[in-house]
Amino acid sequence: AGADVHDADAVADIVADADAVLSALGVPFTREPVNTYSRGAANIVAAMQSSGVTRLVVVSSTGAYPAPGRTGAPFALRLFEPVITKTIGKTVYDDIRLMESVVRDSDLDWTIVRPSGLFDLPYVTEYVAGEVDPVGAFTSRSDLADYLVALAVQRGSHDTVTVSTTADTPTMWQMIRREAFKSA
């Protein structure tokens, strides 16, 4: 189910009968202020607390907290990630960090999932997930979805985890080209 996360009443209606909430919000990079992640998280947390739903899994990003010492990341990622997170993606990543704070400050059973750069694959692969540094620069949306569903039925114990696709990933240059030539 879905709702406009800026609308607290719509979020409350969706959450009311849920066993768990999976939040996979996303907005394009912009230089304008962004509040979709943080406001959405605040509305989701409030709705969950008022309806008694306790399990929350939210999608964040490895870019929210770049790890310059990430030895498993390709050189191109270590080169471009700081540029993206401090320029064209700054307002998005600032709001993602606020979202993580809202989630962490809640009394819910939460897990924050930080995928690497997202790309499309029509199938699930053997991905790496958990409290480890991602071994790759990318995460397929299929792998992310598979992991989110698995996490929905587990207790989170306030975990922040990563997920990374290890097979059939694009190169950094293929990803840059894809993003640069996306149709608007």
Label the model's feature ranges.
Residues 1-43, 47-50:
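NAD(P)H-binding glycine-rich loop region in Rossmannoid oxidoreductase-like domains
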Residues 7-8, 31-32, 49-55, 62-184:
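Oxidoreductase cofactor-interface core, primarily capturing Rossmann-like NAD(P)-dependent enzymes
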Residues 24, 59-60:
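Alpha/beta-hydrolase-fold catalytic nucleophile elbow
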